[in-house]
Structures are given as C-alpha cells and as structure tokens.
Amino acid sequence: MHCPFCSATDTKVIDSRLVADGHQVRRRRECTLCHERFTTFEGAELVMPRVIKRDDTRQPFDEDKLRGGMLRAVEKRPVSMDQLEQALTKIKSTLRATGEREINSEMIGNLMMEQLMHLDKVAYIRFASVYRAFEDVSQFGEAIAKLEK
C-alpha cells in the first residue's frame, strides 16, 4: 500500500483488528520511509442486486439512498448511529442472501420498515406514512394498532 504522506510503496502493518461485526479489518500501518502512521479499513466488495422501481425502471442499488431514508425516519429520535448501521447491514445482507440479480424496491421498503419497527416505533410510523402514502388519520391509526399487537 502506498503511504498517503510520502507516496512510498513500502509500508508495514503494525496492528490488525476485526471491526463492524467482523465484516471489516482495521489495519494500523507505518511507512518504512517517513515513519508516519495511518489506518486502513479492508472489507469484501460484494455486489448488490439491481433495483426494479415501481415504474419498472431499473437502477443500481444505492446505499446512500437507503441510509438517507433511514436517517430521515430516525431524525431527533433516540437511535444511535451504530444501531442504524447495524440495521442497514441486516437489510443489505438480506438482499444479498436472496441470490437474485434484481429485486423490487417494495422489498427494500418492507425490510426498512421491519428494521425501523425494531429500532423505534415513531420512526417506523414516520417511514410507513410516507412509504405507504397515508392519506388520512385512520391509516395512521391502523399502523399504530398494528404496532400494539
């Protein structure tokens, strides 16, 4: 690995640890030329399935879009970034585990609602109201009643 400070090609690994529930390796490295230290993270690059939208268009899976939707739902709620990242990891793992090359956007929405239900009930209702396009108060009541079961 090239040193980010002096661009030397020779660095040595000082320390390695598993992070992100064992899905990444954190390595502490030192340049043999300038002796600066830096951290790298290594993880498997896994291919996500393409997303089939409601209008039948297809697009690449966008993790930022998934994260943004979850962040909007949990905004100002007592949900830590670690909890949110774990939920995102579960969603992505479930999508990969289907083995499909393409998945419906509806499946992603349902997985997001499932994770939000476990994280925070208010965040779940927020997301469901937009995702399911609630039009009146009775639909909110039905969603809340479903949570109370």
From Swiss-Prot:
Keywords: ATP-binding, DNA-binding, Metal-binding, Nucleotide-binding, Repressor, Transcription, Transcription regulation, Zinc, Zinc-finger. Disulfide bonds: none annotated. Residues 49-139 form the ATP-cone domain. It comes from the Bacteria. One of its GO terms (biological process) is negative regulation of DNA-templated transcription. The keyword Nucleotide-binding applies. GO terms for molecular function: ATP binding; DNA binding; zinc ion binding. A zinc finger (unnamed) spans 3-34. Transmembrane segments: none annotated. InterPro entries: ATP-cone_dom, NrdR-like_N, RNR_NrdR-like. Its cofactor is Zn(2+). The keyword Nucleotide-binding applies. Negatively regulates transcription of bacterial ribonucleotide reductase nrd genes and operons by binding to NrdR-boxes. NCBIfam families: transcriptional regulator NrdR. PANTHER family: TRANSCRIPTIONAL REPRESSOR NRDR (PTHR30455:SF2). Belongs to the NrdR family. This is Transcriptional repressor NrdR. It comes from Shewanella denitrificans (strain OS217 / ATCC BAA-1090 / DSM 15013).
